């Protein structure tokens, strides 16, 4: 009798542990074996996270204000590099007729390319997820919301390729990262514009550094040396005196620099610094594109399983080129590539 009562109590305990939960994707009621904060619907495939998430509207307001301030500073700095650079190098670079026309064409081309790509990256929507029908069982078919989650901030479905940006306050499709310098996210709709901005900005900074260095050498005051008598001095002392006098002569010439000269020095230092930063960022972005990943996917745990398809086709697909790379390769190279792929398949 005691064994029967204990068995009945066990069944009652199991029954009371089961609880009902509603799937946000299709609206079906699910019977879960235990209280779980995260579960997946067997019909539509949607993932439900019942943990409470709050939206910090005050923090969102301050983040947007900070992004706009940084964006304004970047715009002013870019305009200063363009117009200030033209004014500083004008007597040396643009005064000669042929070279003036040549450098004017290069300056206008780089300026238009950089400003336009920056504007598309900053003021264009980074990527809007597609609108889906959800919440009702008859309209949601089997597997329509596979691995979708519900964004409590936007109150709509979020695909595995979508991430919610708390700085922008919305979900971004294929989000790579939030860039404070453009005041916007880098996603599916403006990622190519962002790469174009990095490329045009890199070439612009290289051009500015070369032109400012060339103009700076022409406007720099001549160095005056006062080494004095060198008879009776050893070679080591003579070398030290020459180095020291060169440094002092350079510092004395800096005091004689005009306003144009100081601007040229600043342009050279600023352009070289930005060239280094843009080169590193462009290399990182192209490497992620080649590996078929984004910055956020690299940070996630799923990106470290080593199953990524590293191929130039990822680069071609990213830039939207309609044809395969093999179409433009010589026939024997394309054949060798196909044989190599088949060989790897047989090995697997």
Regions found by a protein language model. Give the residues of each.
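Membrane-associated feature with strongest affinity for ZDHHC
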Residues: 1-348
